[in-house]
C-alpha cells in the first residue's frame, strides 16, 4: 500500500473517489493489478485474447525531448505506451508535429514549456493561496510536476515555450492527465509565442487525473487553437491563462462530464489577462453531471475576467441545472467583455451574470488581484504591471479601469440571437444549424445595424453590422485523411 496522502480539498456529498491497484479487489472482467516489484501483470480479460499482444509500459520519462532547437519536423509517427508524455518542447523555434497519433500515455501527448517542481508531499494550493510550507514554483524540464497548481498565483510565469511551434493534424486520445500544454510568449513584455494547435482531434484524456487537466491548456501570449474537435473530457476542453490568444473554428462537445463549477472553455481570476478572442466555435451537448454541485457552461469567464471577446459562436443544448444557475456564457464578478454575434439554440437564457464586485475596487483592495495587475518588479512572476507604458498602449481601457473606475459592471452585448425553433435550420439531425435561405433573409432584415459602444473590439459610437457565421468552416478539415499512421 502507498503512504497516506492528500487526495482532495474537501469531501462533500458529491465527491468521488476510488481505489487503484488493490490485488484483493481483482474480481471482475476488465480489471488488472500490477505487481511493480516483480514486474508482473495480473489481468482478467473481458474477451478472448488468444493471439493478442499485451503490453506493460515501464518507461517513466518523456519519449522525445526537443530543447532550444529549430526547424524540426515529426511527421506520421505514432507515440504510444508510455507512463509519461510523448513529446517535450522547451524554447527553440518552428518545431512542427504533424500527422502523428498519440495514445495510451500516462500523462499527456505534448508539453510545450517547462513544468514546476512538485509541491511538498501532502500540500496544495487553492485559488492562488498556497498552503503553509509550499514554496514559490521552481521550473523543471521534461516534467509537468505542479505547474497547474501554481498558475492562479503565478500567472506571469514565462515557462520558455519557444516560438512558432505547430501541432497539426494529430489524433490524441487515451491520455492519463490531459492532452496538450501550449505555452509561448511573455506576459511581462507581451511578446507573442505564435505557437498553435491546428486541425487536431483530441478526446478521452482523463484516464487518471480527472479535473484541471484539460484537452488543451493554453498560456503565455499570442497563441492559437483552431479547427480542432474536442470531446469526452471530464473537465474543461480548454483552460486559458494569458493574453491575446485566439480560440477559433473549434467543435467542442460532451466535455465537463465529471466536473461542476466548470466550462467547456474556462479562464479567470486575473484582471490582467485580457485581449483573448473566442470566435466561430460550435459548442454543444454540455450538461451538468452532478445535480448537487454547481453549474456548467460553454464559456466560463470566472472571477474578475475583463476585456476579452466572445463572438460569432454557435451554442446548442447547453443545460446547467445544479445548485447555481449557469448560462451558456457565464461570467462572475467581472464584466466588460465583448459578447456579440452569437447564436444560442435550445439553451437556457444566456444573460444571467453574477456581478459581485466592482473592478476598480478589487484592483486596489484585493491582495491577490493587486499582485496580478500591479507587480512592478520584472522578476516577480506573481503578475504584470498594467500601469506600465507597454500595457497602457496595448490596453488603454484596462488602464482606465484601474485609474478611473471606468465602465464597471456588465459586458457589452450586441447582435446575439436566441432560438428554440428548429424549423429555421437546414439540417438539424446532422447538427447543421445554418439558416434556411428564407430565414436568413428575415434575419438580415430584422437585425439592422445598431449604434453601440464596444471598446474591446474598437467600436466607439459606431454602427456594428451583424456578421454571418459560416457553419461549414467549423471543426476538423479533411477529417477522413488527417489521423496519420496508427
Feature roles, as predicted:
Residues 1-486:
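Extracellular parallel beta-helix/beta-solenoid repeat domains
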Amino acid at each position: 500500500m502507498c503512504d497516506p496522502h492528500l487526495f482532495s480539498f474537501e469531501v462533500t456529498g458529491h465527491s468521488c473517489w476510488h481505489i487503484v491497484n488493490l490485488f484483493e479487489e481483482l474480481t471482475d472482467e476488465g480489471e488488472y493489478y500490477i505487481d511493480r516489484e516483480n514486474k508482473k501483470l495480473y489481468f482478467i480479460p473481458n474477451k478472448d485474447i488468444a493471439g493478442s499482444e499485451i503490453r506493460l509500459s515501464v518507461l517513466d520519462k518523456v519519449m522525445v525531448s526537443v530543447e532550444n532547437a529549430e526547424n524540426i519536423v515529426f511527421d506520421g509517427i505514432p507515440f504510444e505506451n508510455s507512463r509519461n508524455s510523448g513529446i517535450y518542447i522547451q524554447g527553440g523555434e518552428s518545431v512542427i508535429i504533424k500527422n502523428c497519433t498519440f495514445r495510451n500515455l500516462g500523462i499527456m501527448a505534448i508539453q510545450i514549456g517547462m513544468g514546476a517542481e512538485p509541491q511538498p508531499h501532502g500540500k496544495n494550493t487553492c485559488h492562488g493561496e498556497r498552503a503553509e510550507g509550499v514554496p514559490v514554483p521552481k521550473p523543471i524540464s521534461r516534467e509537468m510536476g505542479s505547474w497547474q497548481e501554481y498558475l492562479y498565483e503565478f500567472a506571469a510565469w514565462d515557462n520558455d515555450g519557444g516560438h512558432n511551434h505547430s501541432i497539426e493534424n494529430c489524433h490524441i486520445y487515451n491520455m492519463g492527465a490531459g492532452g496538450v500544454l501550449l505555452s509561448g510568449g511573455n506576459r511581462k513584455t507581451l511578446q507573442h509565442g505564435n505557437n498553435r494547435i491546428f486541425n487536431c482531434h483530441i478526446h478521452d484524456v482523463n484516464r487518471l487525473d480527472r479535473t484541471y487537466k484539460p484537452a488543451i491548456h493554453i498560456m503565455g501570449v499570442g497563441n492559437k487553437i483552431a479547427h480542432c474537435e474536442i470531446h469526452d473530457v471530464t473537465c474543461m476542453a480548454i483552460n486559458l491563462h494569458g493574453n491575446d490568444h485566439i480560440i477559433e473554428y473549434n467543435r467542442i462537445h460532451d466535455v465537463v462530464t465529471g466536473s461542476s463549477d466548470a466550462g467547456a472553455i474556462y479562464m479567470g481570476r486575473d484582471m490582467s489577462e485580457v485581449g483573448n478572442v473566442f470566435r466561430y466555435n460550435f459548442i454543444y451537448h454540455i450538461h451538468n453531471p452532478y445535480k448537487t454541485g454547481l453549474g456548467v457552461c460553454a464559456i466560463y469567464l470566472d472571477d474578475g475576467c475583463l476585456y476579452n471577446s466572445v463572438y460569432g459562436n454557435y451554442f446548442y443544448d447547453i443545460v446547467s441545472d445544479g445548485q447555481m444557475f449557469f448560462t451558456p456564457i457565464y461570467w462572475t464578478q467581472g464584466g466588460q467583455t465583448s459578447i456579440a454575434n452569437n447564436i444560442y439554440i435550445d439553451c437556457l437564457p444566456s444573460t444571467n451574470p453574477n456581478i459581485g464586485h466592482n473592478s476598480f475596487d478589487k484592483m486596489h483592495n484585493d491582495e491577490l488581484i493587486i499582485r496580478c495587475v500591479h507587480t512592478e518588479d520584472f522578476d516577480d512572476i506573481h503578475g504584470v504591471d498594467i500601469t506600465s507604458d507597454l500595457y497602457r498602449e496595448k490596453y488603454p481601457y484596462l488602464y482606465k479601469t484601474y485609474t478611473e473606475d471606468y465602465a464597471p459592471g456588465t459586458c457589452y452585448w450586441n447582435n446575439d440571437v436566441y432560438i428554440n425553433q428548429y424549423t429555421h435550420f437546414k439540417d438539424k439531425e446532422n447538427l447543421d444549424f445554418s439558416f434556411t435561405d428564407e430565414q436568413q433573409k428575415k434575419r438580415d432584415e430584422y437585425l439592422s445595424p445598431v449604434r453601440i459602444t464596444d471598446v474591446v473590439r474598437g467600436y466607439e459610437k459606431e454602427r456594428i453590422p451583424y456578421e454571418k457565421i459560416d457553419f461549414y468552416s467549423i471543426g476538423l478539415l479533411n477529417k477522413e485523411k488527417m489521423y496519420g499512421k496508427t
